[in-house]
């Protein structure tokens, strides 16, 4: 098991704002607490994810080779996106949406219509399109949430996990 110390070496789990500075990161405008696992995996937990940290630990939903048995692929998702129920101390119906990042992979856009394909600059951007890294995805989502307020309901981004083992795309779904 990867194992992460949610007490941050303090014995009791601190409040997000009381975490020691050595654990704090701000990436793409989002605040994280960065925890290093015993097997060298990295877990970046957002302010929204910190209250549920014990439920979002990777050992709750990822066995190292696959999702825990109840996980299921989300229909219509682009990429490997799963809904995985996990145990939560207060909420009986708690589930995570887990997405494996395809950062740096080609997007594979198909463009229809002559007016678009005649624009060389546009087609150059399409030809070089890649998926964003997860930190940029979270940053963009948080900017969107902040600009739209309560008029735009989304799930809160909780954490980014980078396992110590690297996987090929086909191994992740």
Where does each model-flagged region fall?
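Conserved ATP-binding subdomain of kinase catalytic cores across diverse folds
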Residues: 55-173
